[in-house]
Regions:
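Conserved HGGG/HGGXW glycine-rich cap/lid loop of the alpha/beta-hydrolase fold
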Residues: 8-63
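Conserved acidic catalytic loop of the alpha/beta-hydrolase fold
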Residues: 69-86
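Gly/Ala-rich beta-loop-alpha elbow adjacent to hydrolase catalytic centers
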Residues: 90, 94, 98
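Flexible "cap/lid" loop of the alpha/beta hydrolase fold
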Residues: 99-104, 108-147
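Conserved alpha/beta-hydrolase catalytic His-Asp/Glu region
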Residues: 124, 128-133, 143-203
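Short beta-strand/loop motif that positions the catalytic acidic residue
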Residues: 204, 210-212, 216
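Conserved alpha/beta-hydrolase "acid-adjacent" motif
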Residues: 217-223
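Catalytic active-site module of serine/aspartate enzymes centered on a nucleophile-bearing elbow/loop
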Residues: 234-264
Length: 264
């Protein structure tokens, strides 16, 4: 995507009849969507997962952690694979990157958009925006990253899901965060403070599915409601037994909702 910067892409079932391009959230990797790749590929879908720069198996440069560059990375992958009429699906920060892609790249190649607890239009509360997290909480994440990243990641994992997760699952989730670079982990958190996507939402023209857990402690449910109001052709589906990780909290419902939306 840039000189000396390679992005890792998982391309499962490349002969599938419809393409879903997944953008993961912070601080994980494409592996967060394991339970979607497992089932949706069997249903005939081509599932493509990108590891954001700095995370998963992608290269970990010291810069490029802003919505413009991250959406440009996605465009590079779309161009390289030559995919068209695909479903762009983003969770949390990945949802925010998807929204910037729709605005900055005019939704190039995208037939439909799916947002899961997207960190938009602003993850933090602002003078004219009363929803979202407190800025202090994000500053604590940044400081925690530089002070004791394993503990910060453990604390974050503890609020991620609403349903009970087993100890082995929690350890697996933690390992995904360990794959990221510390500097990338902090830079993305800084981006939440420095960047907003209010204007981007207005530019989305494609049918959009919004799945948001009502118990989300990371990206409050109200942000999903704001997205629903701002995106013209959108539908909000509240997940009443989910926190931030609806793709695992209610994985069967999640997969069914996503397939129904794709086939509409």
């Amino acid at each position: 995507v840039q000189p000396n910067v390679k992005i890792y892409v998982e391309d499962l079932n490349p002969c599938g009849r419809k393409v879903i391009l997944f953008l993961h959230g912070w601080p994980g990797s494409h592996k967060l969507f394991e339970y979607q790749f497992d089932q949706l590929s069997k249903m005939g879908y081509r599932c493509i997962g990108i590891d954001t720069r700095g995370f998963g198996y992608s290269d970990k440069p010291y810069d490029g952690y802003n919505y413009n560059r991250l959406s440009d990375d996605v465009r590079c992958v779309v161009n390289e694979l030559g995919i068209k009429n695909f479903i762009l699906a983003g969770h949390s920060t990945g949802g925010a990157i998807a929204i910037r892609y729709m605005a900055r790249h005019k939704g190039h190649g995208v037939a439909k958009l799916a947002l899961f607890a997207a960190a938009a239009p602003s993850l933090i509360k602002r003078p004219n925006f009363p929803y979202g997290s407190n800025k202090e909480d994000i500053i604590n994440i940044i400081q925690g990253t530089y002070l004791d990243r394993p503990k910060m990641l453990r604390d974050f994992g503890d609020i991620f899901f609403f349903q009970h997760t087993t100890q082995p699952f929690s350890e697996w989730f933690l390992q995904l965060g360990f794959q990221a670079a510390g500097w990338a982990t902090a830079e993305i958190a800084k981006m939440w403070i420095e960047e907003v996507l209010f204007n981007d939402l207005e530019e989305i023209r494609v049918p959009t599915l919004i799945i948001h857990g009502i118990h989300d402690k990371v990206v409050p449910f109200q942000l999903g409601e704001v997205q629903n109001q701002c995106i013209k052709n959108s539908r909000l589906v509240p997940f009443i037994f989910s926190g931030h990780g609806s793709f695992y909290d209610q994985k069967d419902d999640f997969n069914m909702e996503l397939m129904r939306f794709i086939e509409e």
